Amino acid sequence: MLAFTLRFIKNKRYFAILAGALVIIAGLASQHAWSGNGLPQINGKALAALAKQHPVVVLFRHAERCDRSDNTCLSDSTGITVNGAQDARALGKAFSADIQNYNLYSSNTVRTIQSATWFSAGRSLTADKKMMDCGSGIYASINTLLKKSQNKNIVIFTHNHCLTYIAKNKRGVKFDPDYLNALVMYAENGKLFLDGEFVPG
């Protein structure tokens, strides 16, 4: 009887520990959403909070490509579709509600330039061909843009293979971005860190 009682008490103790751990995990989950790919999700409000701590770098994949869609082209066949332009404009409006102060960059392709232009509704844009080079050298290129921007927030329109590389290299996760998906980064002492995936809303 004594042995049974001791086992029961021990089991109750383990149960209490387990229940407490589950409560803690549930509390953390309520504060931080995670994408199915393993990246933390960062919405507009969270991005604005991060931007108060340090300049943020938001890297977007361009909008829907014309040459891979049956939808109507905006203009040039190497650019984006009309739908893609409208999606970029809507995203830009939502983004600017939380982040008004940023410098805008893109790679030097028609599709990224058009995406950035529609996203920003005419904000000054700098095209940089180095945003096409998506290996380890991309970090030096981003740091160069940060210095040019005097450590302001920066938005960069680039390509899916760049985002895939960064997610794998920085967090070891597989990220296959859709059109206009984005990653959020920041720099500290010249080193870039990946905060997570930007999710509007």
Swiss-Prot record:
Its EC number is 3.1.3.-. Keywords: Hydrolase, Periplasm, Signal. The keyword Nucleotide-binding does not apply. Its main location: periplasm. Pathway: Bacterial outer membrane biogenesis; lipopolysaccharide metabolism. It is found in: Periplasm. One of its GO terms (biological process) is lipopolysaccharide metabolic process. Catalyzes the dephosphorylation of heptose(II) of the outer membrane lipopolysaccharide core. HAMAP family: Ais (MF_01868). This is Lipopolysaccharide core heptose(II)-phosphate phosphatase. The gene is ais.
